[in-house]
A protein has these predicted regions:
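Catalytic beta/alpha-barrel core
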Residues: 1-6, 11, 18-27, 41-48, ...
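Glycine-rich beta-strand-to-loop/alpha-helix junction loops that act as flexible
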Residues: 2-3, 91-95, 112-115
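Catalytic cores of alpha/beta
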Residues: 7-20, 50-58, 75, 81-82, ...
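Glycine-rich phosphate-binding active-site loops on the catalytic face of alpha/beta enzymes
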Residues: 25-31, 64-74, 108-118
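A generic structural signal for well-ordered alpha-helical segments
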Residues: 34-35
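Short acidic, glycine/proline-enriched helix-loop-strand junctions
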Residues: 38-42, 84-87
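Short Gly/Pro-enriched loop/turn and capping motifs at secondary-structure junctions
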Residues: 70-71, 86, 95-98, 118
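A short pocket-lining beta-strand/turn micro-motif at the edge of beta-sheets
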Residues: 87-88, 108
Length: 118
């Protein structure tokens, strides 16, 4: 997979090198259209309920929650789990070796990302 995809140009480059999935820190209408037509699975970034709802309207059910440390950390994800029970998240941004297990313990978290892994 490839991360921090933020433009149609990057989506095309990712497609040309044969990636299996893409991750973006955010989403807008232009990127949504490009992701949807690329044929490559992707995880769009969200931070707010409005962004989650817009993604759900696209038929998406898995999102990157970014930056987690600035948008409510575990509290936000717990609340989103109650409001959006069918939605899954991969939180990134401020996740550490010390905190990642707390995130992974949540039912709506399928993975985490963090720079400590590098």
């Amino acid at each position: 997979g490839i991360g921090t995809v933020v433009s149609k140009d990057q989506i095309e480059k990712a497609k040309n090198i044969g990636v299996h999935f893409m991750v973006s820190p955010g989403i807008n209408e232009t990127l949504a259209d490009a992701f949807n037509t690329s044929g490559i699975p992707f995880i769009p970034g969200v931070a707010t309920p409005s962004e989650i709802i817009l993604g759900m309207q696209q038929g998406w059910d898995t999102f990157k929650f970014f930056p987690a440390n600035l948008f409510g950390d575990l509290k936000a994800l717990k609340t989103y789990g109650n409001v959006f029970p069918s939605i899954l998240f991969c939180p990134t941004g401020g996740i550490s070796e010390e905190t990642h297990e707390s995130y992974l313990a949540l039912k709506n978290v399928i993975s985490v990302g963090g720079s400590w892994l590098v």
